[in-house]
Amino acid sequence: MNKHQKPVLTGQRFKTRKRDEKEKFEPTVFRDTLVQGLNEAGDDLEAVAKFLDSTGSRLDYRRYADTLFDILVAGSMLAPGGTRIDDGDKTKMTNHCVFSANEDHETIRNYAQVFNKLIRRYKYLEKAFEDEMKKLLLFLKAFSEAEQTKLAMLSGILLGNGTLPATILTSLFTDSLVKEGIAASFAVKLFKAWMAEKDANSVTSSLRKANLDKRLLELFPVNRQSVDHFAKYFTDAGLKELSDFLRVQQSLGTRKELQKELQERLSQECPIKEVVLYVKEEMKRNDLPETAVIGLLWTCVMNAVEWNKKEELVAEQALKHLKQYAPLLAVFSSQGQSELVLLQKVQEYCYDNIHFMKAFQKIVVLFYKADVLSEEAILKWYKEAHAAKGKSVFLDQMKKFVEWLQNAEEESESEGEES
C-alpha cells in the first residue's frame, strides 16, 4: 500500500524562536567553571573580582545565581538544609571562599567588597543575593561555629554598606534557630560587625525601616522574651546601645497604649480619681517616669474636646476645660522636671494651634493658681527652660506675671528676714 507523500516547501528554513529555546540546566558545568576560576585566582581578591566580572558574559549568572553565591560563601553547592553537595570531592570545591577565610573583620570586609563589585556590575543579582542570604541564615545549623561567625560578620558589613536590607534578619526568627540559641548568638556577632561599619543610630534606623525594631525580643525563646533578659544578653556582649534602643522602643509602645486608653477614659468622662489610679498602676507596672506621663496627659486632655475656631472664644473654652482637669495634671506634676515638661508642652501646643497663641499666659496662671505649676518652675521656664517655638511671643506674654512672681518672692524673703 503506497503512502501519499506530504507536500514539502522547498527553499524555506524555519528557526526556533529564541524565547522558545530551552537551555539545558547544567549547574555542575557552571560550578566546575567557577571553582576552577576561583582556584586559579587564589587569595588575590582583586583577581577574583576581575574573574567574576569577565565570566559573567560567558556564564549565566541569572540562572545559576544560587550556585554562584553558594560557592562564593561556602566553597561548594549546598543542598537543602545547608549540607555540601560535593563534600567528598575536593575537585568540585574551592577553599577560596568566605567560610575558608581568616576570621577577622578586615579580611571579611575585603570579601564583602567582592560581592559589592559583582552586584554593582550585574545589578540583576541584587534580589538573588538577598534571597541567598535569607536562605543561608535558615541553614545556620548546618554550619560550624566559625562559619557562622564569618557569615555573621559578612552580613553585618553588607548591611552597613547598604548592599543588603535589614529584612534578611527575619530568617533568624525561625523556631529551631531561636530554641537552640543560634539566632541570638548570630545576631550579636552580626550587630557587632554592623556597628563597626556604622554608628548605632544608623543601625537602629535601618531596623525601624524594616519594621524589626519591635521584633528583637523574638531572637529569644518565649520564656526569655523580656526586655531585662535582652538588655543583659546584649549589654554583656558589648552592645549596650541596642539594649537602650529596645528599652526606648518598648517604652514608646507602652506609652501609645496608655495614651489610647487614657483618651478612651476621658471621652467617657470617667471620674478623675479613677483615672489617677489607673495611671499610677500603669506607671508602676511599666516603670514609666512622671515626666513621660505628664506629657501624655496634656495631649489626651487637649484632644478630649472639639475647640472653637474663633480665637476670642477659644481662650474661655480652654480655661473652663483645663480647670476641670487641673486636679489630674497636679497629681502627675509633683517634680520640678515634670512641671517644666508640662510648660514646654503647653508652649508647643499654643504655638502649633494658632487660635491658642494669646491663651498661653492665661493657661499658665490657671495652672499656678490650681497648684499644677510652682513659682520656681515658671521662673526657670522663663529664664532658661523655654522651648524655641514662639518664645519671643510667649516670653512677652509672661513678662508681667513673672515680674509679679519675682516681687512676691522678694517681699516674702524680706518678711522672713524681719521676723
UniProtKB/Swiss-Prot annotation:
Modification type N6-acetyllysine: residues: 117
CDD domains: W2_eIF5C_like
InterPro entries reported for this sequence: ARM-type_fold, eIF5-mimic_regulator, W2_BZW1/2, W2_domain
GO BP, sorted A to Z: regulation of translational initiation
SMART domains: eIF5C
Segments of this protein annotated with the region Disordered: 1-22
GO cellular component term of the entry, any: cytoplasm
Keywords attached to this entry: Acetylation, Cytoplasm, Phosphoprotein, Translation regulation
All copies of domain W2, residue ranges: 248-415
Localisation per UniProt entry: Cytoplasm
Predominant location: cytoplasm
Modification Phosphoserine occurs at: 412, 414, 419
Pfam families (alphabetical): HEAT_5MP1_2, W2
Tissue and organ distribution: Expressed at high levels in heart, and at lower levels in skeletal muscle, spleen and lung. Expressed at low levels in brain regions where nascent and immature neurons are present.
Subunit (UniProt): Interacts with EIF3E, EIF2S2 and EIF3C.
Family: Belongs to the BZW family.
Biological role: Translation initiation regulator which represses non-AUG initiated translation and repeat-associated non-AUG (RAN) initiated translation by acting as a competitive inhibitor of eukaryotic translation initiation factor 5 (EIF5) function. Increases the accuracy of translation initiation by impeding EIF5-dependent translation from non-AUG codons by competing with it for interaction with EIF2S2 within the 43S pre-initiation complex (PIC) in an EIF3C-binding dependent manner.
Name used for this protein in its record: eIF5-mimic protein 1
Organism: Rattus norvegicus (Rat)
